[in-house]
Amino acid sequence: MAEKKELKTYVHKLYEVDYEKGVIKLKNRRCPRCGSIMAHHMKPVERWHCGKCGYTEFVTKKK
């Protein structure tokens, strides 16, 4: 039989937990078009991208 693989949890990368206040907050943004979690990319241009529907927001630097 094949050996069972242990799953690596990455929930701590997606959410911030404040135990004192009892609040769980999402670190990343949600897509305004479909509501799924967006990915933050730094290269070649900083942007937020939704892998589900293809929506992209480019980050503009304010001077």
Curated annotation (Swiss-Prot):
Which residues bind Zn(2+) per the record? 31, 34, 50, 53
* GO BP annotations listed: translation
**Any idea which UniProt keywords this protein has?**
Metal-binding, Ribonucleoprotein, Ribosomal protein, Zinc, Zinc-finger
- What are the GO MF terms of this UniProt record? structural constituent of ribosome; zinc ion binding
Q: Which GO terms describe its cellular component?
A: ribonucleoprotein complex; ribosome
Mind telling me which Pfam families this protein's record contains? Ribosomal_S27
| Superkingdom of the source species | Archaea
Name the SUPFAM superfamilies on file.
Zn-binding ribosomal proteins
Q: Kindly list the cysteine pairs connected by disulfide bridges.
A: none
Q: Where does the signal sequence lie?
A: none
- Is Membrane one of the keywords? no
The family database entries (InterPro entries) matched by this protein are listed as: Ribosomal_eS31 (IPR002906), Ribosomal_eS31_arc (IPR022845), Ribosomal_zn-bd (IPR011332)
Note accompanying the cofactor annotation: Binds 1 zinc ion per subunit.
Q: Which coenzyme or cofactor does it need?
A: Zn(2+)
Quote the HAMAP family the UniProt record gives. Answer: Ribosomal_eS31
Quaternary organization: Part of the 30S ribosomal subunit.
Q: Which family does it belong to?
A: Belongs to the eukaryotic ribosomal protein eS31 family.
Q: What name is this protein filed under?
A: Small ribosomal subunit protein eS31
* Upper taxonomic lineage: Archaea, Thermoproteota, Thermoprotei, Desulfurococcales, Desulfurococcaceae
| UniProt gene name | rps27ae
